[in-house]
Design a protein with these regions (language model features):
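Mid-domain alpha/beta scaffold segments of enzyme catalytic cores
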Residues: 1-178
């Protein structure tokens, strides 16, 4: 009998494993949101919602954390045009995280709200070569297709159950969906 591939929860905030359900979880750790790297597989990132005056310190914590084998990715990181933090600050911090991901050869888990052009432009300008996952993708199939053609992946959540992403779900290949 062939072994089954476990479900991978790419982005969780749970502090406990769900092994009984054959789920492999990657915990999200926001270093600037009072969390520490744990002994479970995780990603670390400076989420745009929590950017503050300690950014350089937080980037140092991130660089140290990236030395640990449990840290599998950088994220959530990205740009959110609906928050009050200046776009230039968000862009600068995002770019620094992209550079760290490149240096440590880690995938990026992207938080993107109304900033697809800025994020894709940064990834191209910085010649980023590692995997890129657009977390919580809620846009249409046309944009999704453009991102997939660039080699990026999309992750979706429960919002896809309301019918707003039926076209995306009908067309996207499972190899591009996380």
């Amino acid at each position: 009998m062939a072994s089954q591939i476990p479900y991978i929860d790419l982005h969780t905030h749970r502090n406990y494993p769900v092994s009984a359900l054959e789920v492999r979880s990657i915990k999200n750790v926001a270093l600037n949101h009072s969390e520490l790297v744990t002994e479970v597989d995780c990603s670390v990132g400076l989420h745009p919602w929590y950017i503050n005056g300690n950014t350089e310190h937080d980037l140092g914590l991130m660089a140290n954390a990236l030395e640990r084998k449990q840290v599998l990715a950088i994220g959530e990181c990205g740009i959110d045009k609906t928050i009050e933090i200046p776009l230039t600050d968000q862009q600068s911090i995002f770019d620094k995280q992209v550079c760290l991901a490149q240096k440590y050869q880690k995938p990026l888990i992207i938080h993107c709200v109304r900033a697809f052009e800025e994020i894709v432009s940064s990834l191209k300008r910085l010649d980023f070569k590692e995997p890129v996952i657009f977390h919580g993708y809620r846009k249409n199939w046309i944009l999704g297709q453009q991102l997939i053609r660039k080699g990026y992946y999309l992750s979706i959540g429960q919002h896809c159950l309301n019918g707003s992403q039926d076209e995306l779900l009908q067309h996207i290949s499972l190899c591009h969906l996380l």
